[in-house]
């Protein structure tokens, strides 16, 4: 328990005060780049959290759902692409809150997709995929919730998402470079227990894990989206940030609608 406490203190200080140093993304080896949701401890944690989350009671008056109420109000079947959706917990979350029929594509790493299909072979209306070629339906809304910042080739990936021609595009909890047009890269450190939906107090096997985090230019992001989409909501969370070379980069939220 003392070790876990010290790890939490270190990560807190690292995030809020010390910060991270810029790294050259070309010098990050392939093994580290592919580590996200690709090694056993993290995979098993995601599965464990997913089982807990399915049993969790969701508060229907939660403010974070208000943004979707108008989008879903006149639709019975809603097709969603959840980019980096972990174990697919948002599918269960949305189904409980909105009482709609969802068909859910959960885009994740190949290792996690294989494990999810093995552990939950009889899931209905949710399909775990590891690339966009597996999409079989036109998408109503694309969700990128704290996932875009872990994509290395962000411009190309964003272009691929835009090409899907979804009616809505929603990005949230994503660090953005509001200062210039550069893509920044750091080796982000987090606690293992912080990954996936929610946190587990006193997690017995907690440890520090590291993986690349890419901070995309907010101006480039808006320019790419503006060709096909109209911005209908934007906010910055001043309490959620990453420090890189003593500069804060805040989490952004965007909701776009197809023109």
Predicted regions and their residues:
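N-terminal accessory regions of S-adenosyl-L-methionine
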Residues: 1-79, 88, 183-259
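Conserved acidic residues
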Residues: 78, 140, 167
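Class I SAM-dependent methyltransferase core
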Residues: 82
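Class I SAM-dependent methyltransferase SAM/SAH-binding core
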Residues: 85-125
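Short acidic low-complexity segments
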Residues: 127-138
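A short SAM/SAH-binding and catalytic strip from SAM-dependent methyltransferases
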Residues: 140-154
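A short, conserved alpha-helix within the catalytic core of class I
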Residues: 150-164, 171
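Conserved beta-strand signature within the Rossmann-like core of class I S-adenosyl-L-methionine
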Residues: 165-180, 185
């Amino acid at each position: 328990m003392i070790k876990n406490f010290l790890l939490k203190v270190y990560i807190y200080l690292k995030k809020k005060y010390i910060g991270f140093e810029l790294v050259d993304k070309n010098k990050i080896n392939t093994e580290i780049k592919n580590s996200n949701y690709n090694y056993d401890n993290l995979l098993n944690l995601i599965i464990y959290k997913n089982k807990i989350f399915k049993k969790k009671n969701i508060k229907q008056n939660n403010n974070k759902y208000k943004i979707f109420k108008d989008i879903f109000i006149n639709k019975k079947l809603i097709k969603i692409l959840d980019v980096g959706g972990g174990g697919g917990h948002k599918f269960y979350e949305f189904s409980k809150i909105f009482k709609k029929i969802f068909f859910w594509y959960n885009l994740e790493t190949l290792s996690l997709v294989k494990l999810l299909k093995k552990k939950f072979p009889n899931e209905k209306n949710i399909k775990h995929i590891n690339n966009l070629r597996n999409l079989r339906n036109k998408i109503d809304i694309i969700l990128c919730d704290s996932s875009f910042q872990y994509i290395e080739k962000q411009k190309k990936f964003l272009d691929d998402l835009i090409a899907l021609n979804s009616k809505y595009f929603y990005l949230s909890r994503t660090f953005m470079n509001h200062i210039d047009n550069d893509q920044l890269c750091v080796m982000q450190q987090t606690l293992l227990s912080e990954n996936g939906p929610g946190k587990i107090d006193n997690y017995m096997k907690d440890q520090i894990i590291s993986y690349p985090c890419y901070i995309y230019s907010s101006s480039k992001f808006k320019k790419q989206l503006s060709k096909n989409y109209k911005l209908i909501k934007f906010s910055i969370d001043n309490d959620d940030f990453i420090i890189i070379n003593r500069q804060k980069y805040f989490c952004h939220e965007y909701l776009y609608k197809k023109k």
